[in-house]
A protein has these predicted regions:
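A secondary-structure capping/hinge motif
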Residues: 328-336, 376-389
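Short, positively charged patches
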Residues: 60
Length: 402
């Protein structure tokens, strides 16, 4: 008879990220009836609950919580890993990949002016910013960084804010004034990457107040794909999906492995790549291009599975082949068919990195007529066949780091 485990999950559940993470945990344990889950608040990490549970998945928000959990000697998966403790297993999103994805997205849209908007002294914001800046500087660009005002005793982040568990820093009026000044002074058009969707909604709201067009003057990209912020902004916000569902699933898998092992549990670490960018109107802009160009690009992205050709794009936008090709060469430096091929490869790479989908299904999903044709084209573009890329790139969903 299998041993029964009582598992405590202490994760905030007010945000979409937290709820998706919890869903991932629940999905993993759904077919494991010997594992009973209890959803707790961080404040409920007490001597009694520590005794009652065999393992923990939590966001460790302070040293007191860390000490209490460590003293039990029980398996713990820290689901934030900003200042990791060597004795615990950890699960974290790939902050560097998020910043890199944002930079590459804006570069693909041919922006030359860039900005970053985050928080003061908040680790996840700093890590995303650093990767964003590094990629742009490698391409010869110098992004403008918004630096929130220093307000003694008022906008220093609390432990919860440091972990991204509350909505923004203190001193909101002063912050809004400084952010408005920063937005006004940015060279236009500009692409602004925000460390999360709450910050992106701040920028969108202030752009409206300043009569700055989004995305024509200011393109905005957030992180977390939180429907409350993304769908209630006008226009709706594009956002990077960190794949909280996969993070929760991986955290549960880590804990279950340790609970099920008869050997002393060795701390493990996993880093999960972002799922990708959820495109909405706030980044639907290509500086210097005619109005129909963004529609053409969206059409290519949305119809890639159908195996579309350049002729389909010409028909969709309603302009001549000569005109459309001339604009594509001017804006992107490539033909329409070359852009279609690049979008296909980019989509395939994303699926190979972030899913366990069979390669034949990836070929179909990205519009290739056969797995052989897909493999040949992918190898020509990337230098490796799809299977080798999956092994040498970021493994799907669960990169282990011992």
């Amino acid at each position: 008879m299998k041993r029964r485990f009582q598992i405590a999950v202490a994760i905030e559940r007010t945000s979409e990220y937290g709820r998706r993470f919890l869903q991932g945990v629940a999905n993993f344990f759904d077919d494991k009836p010997n594992c009973q889950l209890a959803l707790l608040n961080p404040s409920q990490v007490t001597d009694r609950t520590l005794d009652e549970h065999d393992g923990w998945i939590c966001r460790i928000t302070n040293k007191r919580m860390l000490t209490k959990l460590h003293d039990t000697g029980k398996p713990v998966v820290d689901a934030i890993c900003l200042t990791p403790f060597r004795g615990f297993s950890t699960i974290r999103t790939d902050y560097s990949a998020i910043g890199t994805l944002a930079a590459e997205h804006f570069l693909a849209h041919r922006f030359v002016n860039f900005g970053f908007c985050g928080y003061r002294h908040v680790t996840f914001s700093d890590l995303r910013r650093n990767a964003f800046v590094r990629v742009l500087e490698e391409r010869g660009f110098r992004p403008n960084i918004y630096r929130p005002p220093y307000l003694p005793n008022r906008n220093q982040p609390t432990p919860a804010q440091q972990l991204g568990l509350t909505e923004g820093p203190l001193g909101e009026a002063e912050d809004a004034e400084c952010l408005s000044t920063w937005l006004r002074r940015l060279p236009k058009p500009v692409a602004v990457f925000c460390c999360d969707d709450f910050r992106a909604s701040d920028v969108a709201r202030l752009c409206k107040r300043l009569r700055l067009g989004v995305p024509d003057d200011v393109a905005i990209l957030g992180v977390d794909n939180d429907p409350v912020y993304c769908m209630f902004s006008s226009p709706r916000l594009s956002s990077i999906d960190p794949d909280a569902l996969a993070l929760g699933h991986a955290a549960a898998e880590l804990l279950h492995r340790q609970l099920s092992s008869r050997k002393a549990h060795r701390p493990l670490a996993r880093t999960i790549p972002p799922k990708g960018i959820v495109m909405r109107a706030s980044t639907d802009s290509y500086p210097g291009a005619p109005d129909w160009f963004a529609d053409a690009m969206s059409y290519i992205e949305n119809e890639i599975r159908t195996g579309l050709s350049a002729s389909d794009v010409f028909r969709h936008v309603g302009y001549s082949r000569t005109l459309v090709e001339r604009v594509f060469r001017k804006v992107l430096g490539k033909t329409v068919q070359e852009e279609i091929a690049e979008v296909r490869i980019r989509a395939a790479k994303q699926l190979l990195r972030t899913t366990a989908m069979p390669i034949k299904d990836i070929a179909a999903e990205t519009g290739y007529r056969s797995i052989e044709y897909f493999t040949r084209k992918f190898k020509a573009a990337v230098g490796h066949p799809p299977a080798a890329y999956r092994l040498t790139g970021t493994p799907p969903r669960s990169r282990s780091e011992s």
